[in-house]
Regions:
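Conserved protein kinase catalytic/activation segment
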Residues: 94-106
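Conserved ATP-binding subdomain of kinase catalytic cores across diverse folds
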Residues: 1-53, 75-83
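AlphaC helix of the protein kinase catalytic domain
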Residues: 54-63
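Catalytic-loop of the protein kinase fold
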Residues: 85-92
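Hydrophobic/anchoring residues in structured secondary elements
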Residues: 29-32, 92, 97
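C-lobe/activation-segment region of protein kinase-like
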Residues: 103-157
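Short, glycine/acidic-enriched loop or turn micro-motifs at the edges of active sites
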Residues: 50, 92, 110
Length: 157
C-alpha cells in the first residue's frame, strides 16, 4: 500500500484512544479491498453512538454548567496532549455529547500520533484554531472554552 487508508487510520486511532480511556466509538470492523498492490475500497464500521453533535447544539446548552461540555472538552484536549495526538479536523460536528452525557471524539480519519514536538505543536495549534472557528459568531462560547482549558491546566498544576 502506497499510502495510509483513512479507514485504517480511524480504526487504529479509535483503538489507541479507547486503550487510553479517551471516549470515542468502538471500532467494530475494517475491510480493505485491494487489487494487486493498490487499494480499491475501504470500509469502516464503528459502534453507533446516540447523542447530539456540538455543532447542532444551542450555544446556551453548550456552555450550560450542568452538562459540563467545556470541562469535558478540556479533558479530551489534554488526553490527546498526553498521547501527543492531534485530531486533524477538530470541528464541533466531530464531537458528540452522548446519551450518558459523555463527550466523545468521532471522525478519526485524520488523527496523528506525533513523534516530533515541532510538528505536533504546529498541528495542535491548527486543531485549536479549527475548534474555536466553530464559535466565531459567539465570543462568549469561545471565552467559556478557553476558561475551561485554563481551569484544567491550573487544577493539574
Amino acid at each position: 500500500m502506497l499510502f495510509t487508508v483513512r479507514a485504517l487510520t480511524s480504526w487504529t486511532g479509535g483503538h489507541v484512544l479507547r486503550l487510553f480511556g479517551v471516549p470515542t466509538p468502538r471500532p467494530v470492523a475494517c475491510l480493505i479491498e485491494k487489487s494487486g498492490p493498490l487499494q480499491k475500497q475501504a470500509y469502516l464500521l464503528m459502534e453507533k453512538v446516540s447523542g447530539e453533535h456540538l455543532y447542532w447544539m444551542d450555544h446556551a446548552k453548550v456552555i450550560d454548567a450542568g452538562l459540563g461540555v467545556p470541562a469535558q472538552f478540556a479533558s479530551r484536549w489534554h488526553e490527546l496532549c498526553l498521547l501527543r495526538a492531534t485530531h486533524g479536523d477538530m470541528k464541533a460536528s466531530n464531537l458528540i455529547l452522548d446519551d450518558e452525557g459523555v463527550l466523545q471524539l468521532i471522525d478519526l480519519d485524520s488523527i496523528l500520533f506525533h513523534r516530533s514536538g515541532r510538528g505536533y505543536e504546529r498541528q495542535r495549534g491548527k486543531d485549536m484554531a479549527r475548534f474555536m472557528r466553530n464559535w466565531k459568531e459567539s465570543p462568549k462560547v469561545q471565552e467559556v472554552f478557553r476558561g475551561a482549558l485554563i481551569a484544567y491546566d491550573e487544577a493539574r498544576g
